[in-house]
Structures are given as C-alpha cells and as structure tokens.
Amino acid sequence: MIIVHIADITMFYAPASGGVRTYLDAKHRRLGRQPGIRHSLLIPGAHFSERDGIYEVPAPALPFGKGYRFPLRLGPWRNILHGLQPDLIEVGDPYLTAWAALDARRQLDVPVIGFYHSDLPLLVSNRMGPWFTPNVEAYVRKLYGNFDRVLAPSQIMADKLIGLGVRNVHVQPLGVDLQTFHPSHRDPGLRTELGVAEDSRLLIFAGRGSKEKNLPVLLNCMQRLGKRYHLLLVGSAMPTAVPENVTVIDEFCPASQVARLMASADALVHAGDQETFGLVILEAMASGIPVVAVAAGAFQEIVTAEGGLLCAPNNPLAMAHAVQELFAQGCAERGQRARRHVERYYAWDTVVASLLEHYRAVLGTQQPMLAHG
C-alpha cells in the first residue's frame, strides 16, 4: 500500500496538559484510521518507549512543571526522526524539538511544518517583563522563518507572526470532540451535588487558574451578579478565597468529568484576554451551552452570535451585564445553536481534512505518495 508517513514532535505533552495534547491525540486517532497514512508522535518521557506509534523520548521533568518535561539533548530526537524516515514533520513547540526537526530535515530532505500554538513573546513578557521581548521576537522570527509552512490556530496569532516578518503563515483552527462534549452528558443532580438552589443560574469556568485567565474578573463579576447566580471553577491552581456564590474544584479533571459539568451548567464564562485559540469555548458550545467571553485574543474569532456574547476585557461590570443579557435572551436556545455551530465548523474530522490539505501542499502532491517508508 502507498503510504505517507507524518511525524509530530513536541514537548507540549503531559498528563495534565491542554490544547496541544488534545489536538495531537485527536489527530493521531484519526490519521490512524486513514488508509495510506502512517502517523508517529514523538513526546518527552521518563525513558524511551514506543506504543501504537507514540514514541517517548527521555527528557528530565521540570520542577513544579505538573508533568511537563524539558528536552536538553537534541541528538535523541533527531536520531529517532532519522530512524523513522517520515515524509513530513510537524513541530508543536518553539524549543529544542523544533531544532531537532530542522536538523533532521537536512539529512532526510523532507518538509517541516511549524505549528505556532503558543505566543512566546507574550508568555515571556508576562513572566519576566518586557525587557526580553525584542530578543524573543527575533528568536521567533528566526525559528519560524526556517519552516516550509507555518500554521497558526487563529487569525490573531497569524497576524502576530506576519508582523514579525514570518512568511507562508496559514490559519488552521483546532477542533472539539463532539462525542466527549455532548448535551447528553447533562446531569440534573449537579445542583444538588453542589448544594445550590435548583433555580440558580449555574455558570462554569474550566481551565488552569493562571494569571492570564483573569479569574479576579470572574470573582468580581459574581459579586455583582449576586446569589441568583452561581459559578463553578474547575481546574488546577484555582483561588481559595472566593465569594459565597462560587464553588471551586481545585484539581485537574479528566475530559469526561469536565464534559458532565459543562453540559450540566447553563453557560461558560471566560475573562482571559490572551487566548491563542480557546479550546474550552468550543467544548462548552459542543456541550450545548452558550458562552460569555471577553472581546480579546482569539475569542473574537470563535465566539459568534450563535454561540454567545462578548464583553469588554478586564471589566467585571461589563461581564455581569453580558451574563444577564444572555439569560434574558434565552440560554437554552442559544446553547442549541452553539452546538450546531461547532458541529458544522469544528469537528475534528473537518480539522484533520484541512490539515491534510496543508500536508499535500508542502509535499507537492494531490494524493499521499511514498517518499521514505
């Protein structure tokens, strides 16, 4: 059988990691079912192993890194790529694995695609201040200028790369698992479980409690909304000092549990103003609930009238008004429209089909063709 072999390589893969792992897992499953396609995934691990096309490459664990590992040696990653001899490599982070892929390209003579999942200059600026921004921007320009094609999950991310001088940038949205996140997972007993009134208006936020999520805005918003509304915060590093109408599940929850909680809520709220895509927004809409998010980052692209409302960033009063307006317009009906919207545009099968078009373009073929093995 004629086979095209695609290899993904990234350090952004850990037990509790977010959008990148979700994307890679969904992609690996679907490419595995495609006739004529082989997919390999290279990720960090405690020791070398291989199972079902997923290769773990030894890398030290990051202290306090919540399962993340940081590769320090380029050689093992490059050597595995040499042994696999893929026809195309996709890079999922801007660190050592990216340079390993580019190094392997020199011997294999295959195209390498870079997927710009994380806004590195903004990330460094948030953590270390603006002094390093010019150097980080120069690094991003140099690294992503080496790829045969660059993918970005949203137009705002693509525009940032283009603004840095990176060429051949294409927007490639991510997707959502329409079976895992489904309205049928709604649990009528959740309000009783949480100890809130049956007629309460239940909001939810799911994700990491990092600075960029602007959780103080949500907490202030809940104080303004009052006891008729209740917010459930789900995820690691959540605040402990919260208003009475807020419940916290301060731990990483598997997708199945998050899906039950989402489908059982009335709406999702999100105050993060630096999102590169916003996968949790799609998960909420797939669960049949609308969203209230801030008009910033990629949310302006994925939150449409079908799925919810946008409000001014960093403004608890504006968010409270948007939540009230959402309920006044009817949450249930808008949640149904949100579900139909993601079914149409964000199913993983649709996303993978779009990815394959990018792969065909850089391989220079209309159909997958054998180049290595």
Where do the language-model regions lie?
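Short alpha-helical donor nucleotide-sugar binding micro-motif in glycosyltransferases
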Residues: 144, 260-265
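Donor nucleotide-sugar binding/catalytic pocket of nucleotide-sugar-dependent glycosyltransferases
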Residues: 137-186
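Nucleotide-sugar donor phosphate/pyrophosphate-binding loop at the beta->alpha transition
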Residues: 111, 122-142
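Nucleotide-activated donor-binding/catalytic signature segment of Leloir-type glycosyltransferases, i.e.
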Residues: 235-259, 267
